[in-house]
């Protein structure tokens, strides 16, 4: 009997988490050691200048940008609109082979950016100090151009293919994907017939303090979002004469209880395996503690140190983040209603309804309404040994015998739409980043180094060729 975790055979999980696989030589040399990298820089700068802040999205402008490129390259393409101004771009490079197609997935929308806080205008796409600056440089306009260059490079050089390559740029990912990948999977499933693998954001190459690669990460599973809105009601009036039971006061008390609340620690088998595999990167006591994280967390001193690091804490517990508060729009008006948006991320296997019931008890005020804004079930990627092998060989070829690990994704991506249909969707774009670099995603002064971007273009092409070239 084959043992599985989250639907993935133990043998494959072992390969993912420990990855001590001997590299094999690629069947063919890479198409080009240096694709049109200067062209790619110009494309990325232009792409960043297309403001696709969601809301409202306006991805139609980005879709038209890509369509012009594909038309120029002679690649089959079409724009698929899901709502006014909301669009997805689909392009397909067809092969003569019978192998299942591969999708290069990315999203075209970006989160808002406050220009007053940035050193460079967030939609300038300026190239300065060795970086390309702008919202989306990392999430996910930079990776989209990396994927684009793989497709058009292989088309230009007439590489014989054993599988179709699909480029898919979606709308609305930053708001849950209902108008993007969700819409396409529901309304246009024919576009994905015969698809065997999807590559998306969610993994990459992690650097150490010395600038050298420490390990590669592949996204195979993610925490699931449970976005909530808490609403309190009370007597409205003039700010000069406050009454008891004000909506804002009730909301603040409830939010304070949430801030004080500590969700329980749960070490899932997938997480235990990830830290055990990552233990080789640690030294001293930390190595043995990571080797058996569940046991180590019973030590209060280690637990306090470990949970102090946000990315570690989020890997072993449900998280609750207050992300927005709304009351009156005038200083001297007491509102009848006050609300707060809450971003909850649940570990795989958690029941959203049960979690909300527990949250109500923490809040301790039955008059506060709890509304679900977004929720969907967790989905772990079905296995795809060939993709893992291609990523592992890429690591060995360029960075030696370093681990390839599968951490639990703390955010969510469009992958879940494909995983729910049984299609393997792996998070991996070969861009190099540090722990501190994560703060640039959705943060101030988002930027990608030109060197990193150009290397990713070469590495992505190398990996895609391994998967689809004859």
Which residues does each PLM region occupy?
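Bacterial N-terminal signal peptides
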Residues: 11-24
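Acidic/His- and Gly-rich active-site-bordering loop/insert found
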Residues: 29-135, 148, 154-163, 342
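An extended, acidic, His-containing surface patch that forms the Zn2+-binding/catalytic region
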Residues: 97-99, 204-207, 266-329, 336, ...
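A common structural junction motif
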Residues: 108-109, 258-263, 360-368
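Acidic/histidine-rich catalytic neighborhood of metal-dependent amide-processing enzymes
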Residues: 131-132, 138-217
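A short core secondary-structure module
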Residues: 182-187, 235, 240-264
């Amino acid at each position: 009997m084959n043992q599985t975790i989250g639907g993935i055979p133990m043998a494959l999980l072992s390969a993912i988490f420990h990855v001590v696989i001997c590299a094999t030589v690629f069947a063919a040399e890479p198409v080009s050691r240096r694709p049109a990298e200067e062209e790619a820089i110009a494309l990325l700068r232009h792409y960043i200048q297309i403001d696709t802040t969601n809301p409202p999205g306006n991805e139609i402008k980005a879709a038209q940008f890509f369509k012009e490129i594909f038309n120029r390259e002679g690649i089959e393409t079409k724009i698929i609109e899901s709502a006014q101004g909301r669009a997805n771009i689909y392009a397909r490079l067809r092969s003569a082979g019978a192998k299942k197609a591969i999708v290069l997935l990315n999203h075209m929308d970006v989160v808002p950016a406050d220009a007053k806080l940035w050193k460079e205008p967030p939609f300038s796409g300026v190239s300065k100090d060795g970086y390309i600056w702008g919202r989306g440089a990392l999430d996910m306009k930079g990776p989209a151009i990396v994927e684009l260059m793989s497709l058009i490079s292989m088309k230009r050089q007439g590489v014989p293919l054993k599988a179709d390559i699909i480029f898919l740029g979606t709308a609305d990912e930053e708001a849950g994907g209902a108008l993007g990948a969700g819409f396409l999977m529901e309304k246009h499933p024919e576009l994905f017939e015969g698809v065997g693998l999807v590559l998306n954001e969610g993994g990459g190459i992690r650097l150490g303090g010395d600038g050298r690669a420490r390990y590669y990460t592949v996204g195979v599973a993610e925490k699931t979002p449970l976005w909530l809105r808490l609403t309190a009601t009370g007597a409205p009036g003039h700010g000069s004469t406050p009454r008891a039971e004000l909506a804002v006061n009730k909301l603040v008390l409830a939010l304070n209880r949430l801030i004080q609340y500590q969700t329980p620690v749960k070490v899932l088998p997938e997480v235990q395996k990830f830290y055990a595999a990552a233990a080789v990167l640690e030294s001293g006591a930390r190595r043995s503690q990571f080797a058996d994280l569940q046991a180590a967390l019973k030590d209060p001193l280690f637990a306090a140190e470990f949970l102090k690091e946000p990315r570690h804490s989020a890997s072993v517990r449900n998280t609750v983040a207050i992300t927005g508060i709304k009351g009156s729009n005038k200083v001297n008006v007491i509102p009848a209603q006050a609300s707060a948006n809450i971003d909850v991320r649940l570990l795989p296997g958690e029941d959203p309804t049960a979690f909300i019931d527990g949250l109500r008890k923490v809040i301790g005020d039955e008059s506060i309404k709890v509304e679900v804004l977004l929720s969907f079930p967790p989905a772990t990627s079905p296995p795809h040994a060939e993709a893992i092998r291609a990523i592992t060989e890429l690591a060995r070829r360029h960075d030696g015998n370093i681990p390839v690990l599968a951490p639990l994704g703390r955010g969510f991506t469009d992958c879940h739409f494909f995983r729910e249909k049984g299609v393997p969707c792996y998070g991996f774009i070969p861009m190099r980043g540090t722990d501190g670099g994560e703060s640039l995603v959705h943060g101030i002064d988002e930027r990608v180094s030109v060197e990193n971007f150009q290397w990713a273009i070469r590495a992505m092409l190398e990996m895609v060729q391994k998967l689809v070239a004859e």
